[in-house]
């Protein structure tokens, strides 16, 4: 129960702080920016797909099959593949925003921030999950609090100093990336590249296929819904903001059960 509470705290924190951030950015910079949450909402399921295979699956592969190289192998392979996928999305950011029926000129800069933040959060989650499976829950929660507060403080403080969106994004993303990189290096183990990807898929197959389904549902569903304009987008955003934290907290039950 104690571990469940710690994990639920971590997952709800990961969801709650970005929600507050988008609210404040909407007040400080541009009221439309809160809709970035909905614009990039489908992409979080790419995050969960990678996490399912290369973090959860890899950690279970280590525990069940005695493959001590699985966790670090999953981190490295997952990082390489996720860099390629998120890089492709960023390279085609204009097409993505257009597909979602939103204004490129309004949303592009902070859409880039949102995608980069999601990518860095994925890399961070690889290490966080590793610590949970090693039962270093207190340390994992400490890192989680620092990561989220760092993201929040940098983003909001910079937006209060300047309204230049590019400067805000750079000033937030670079320190966040450096912090995550330091944690990965600090908590990495020596390993040989060895991972049974098919077993990793099998061990967390239910969550994996759920996330693939949700990716397709939200990608095409929100694309159609956002055709109705900014007011409808705002309504969808508020619904997502309310439910997202609850979903992440409930996900702690799955995470805790999987670890056990």
Where in the sequence are the language-model features?
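Short membrane-interface helical motifs at transmembrane helix boundaries
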Residues: 26, 83-108
């Amino acid at each position: 129960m104690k571990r469940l509470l710690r994990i639920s705290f971590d997952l709800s924190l990961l969801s709650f702080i970005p929600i507050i951030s988008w609210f404040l950015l909407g007040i400080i910079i541009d009221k439309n920016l809160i809709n970035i949450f909905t614009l990039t909402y489908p992409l979080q399921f790419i995050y969960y797909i990678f996490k399912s295979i290369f973090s959860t699956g890899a950690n279970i592969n280590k525990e069940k099959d005695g493959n001590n190289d699985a966790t670090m192998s999953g981190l490295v392979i997952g990082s390489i593949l996720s860099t390629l996928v998120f890089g492709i999305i960023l390279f085609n950011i204009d097409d993505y925003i257009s597909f979602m029926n939103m204004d490129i000129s309004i949303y592009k800069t902070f859409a880039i921030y949102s995608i980069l933040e999601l990518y860095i959060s994925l890399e961070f989650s690889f290490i966080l999950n590793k610590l949970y499976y090693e039962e270093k829950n207190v340390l994992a929660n400490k890192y989680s609090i620092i990561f989220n507060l760092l993201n929040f403080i940098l983003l909001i403080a910079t937006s209060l100093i300047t309204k230049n969106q590019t400067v805000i994004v750079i000033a937030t993303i670079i320190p966040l990336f450096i912090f995550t990189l330091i944690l990965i290096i600090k908590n990495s183990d020596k390993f040989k590249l060895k991972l049974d990807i098919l077993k990793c898929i099998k061990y967390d197959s239910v969550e994996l296929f759920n996330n693939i389904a949700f990716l397709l549902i939200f990608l095409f569903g929100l694309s159609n819904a956002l055709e109705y304009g900014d007011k409808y987008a705002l309504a969808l955003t508020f619904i997502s903001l309310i439910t997202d934290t609850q979903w992440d907290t409930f996900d702690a039950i799955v995470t805790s059960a999987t670890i056990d």
